[in-house]
Amino acid sequence: MVCDGMGGAKAGNIASRLAVESFLTVLQQQAPQDWGQNPHELLTRCVEGANQAVFQRSIHDPDCTGMGTTMVAALVLEEKAYVLNVGDSRAYLIRESEGIQRITRDHSVVEALVSRGELSQEAARFHPQKNLITRALGAEARVKCDLYDLTLLPGDFLLLCSDGLSNQMDDQEISYEVLHGGPTETCCERLLQLAMSRGAPDNVTVVLLQK
């Protein structure tokens, strides 16, 4: 799971931490052996619980007014991965024989322009409004998340990241580093170093899983 908080440094950190903790609290209320029974319903409940926790804190704590967070998460059960996202943190599937595939679609101003054919993916990375998101966890009393189902093959990589990475590196660069970067931990460190060297903020987050 990756959450990228907003609303100032302090409030953003609170939002992202609270979202993760609340999500896991709801998830752990159901026995792990039952997670596969209805994963979409389970993930939706987890997101709704996290959203309520962040939203209630934002309206009752003056220091947290207006805070929110993105969220991208994956529930991996054997060869199946169930991915959710809110905001502009991303999930990628990287397969050596096929390259990289972006699984999620950003809830952002520039993504809407891309989907309408008014902006290319490359131009979107440098657009002045690239950081404006249209959906965030905790921004309102209810939240809608997007859900995706994947089948993972042996050797596949599933990468989750905040926009600090995707704003600095294009998909092909990410794919190359994952496929040629060695062990997953080493690869994550390399991706973080590259993003930071190109001017990414301190809160770049990457999670990498290999099947």
Predicted regions and their residues:
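PP2C/PPM-type serine/threonine phosphatase catalytic domain
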Residues: 1-211
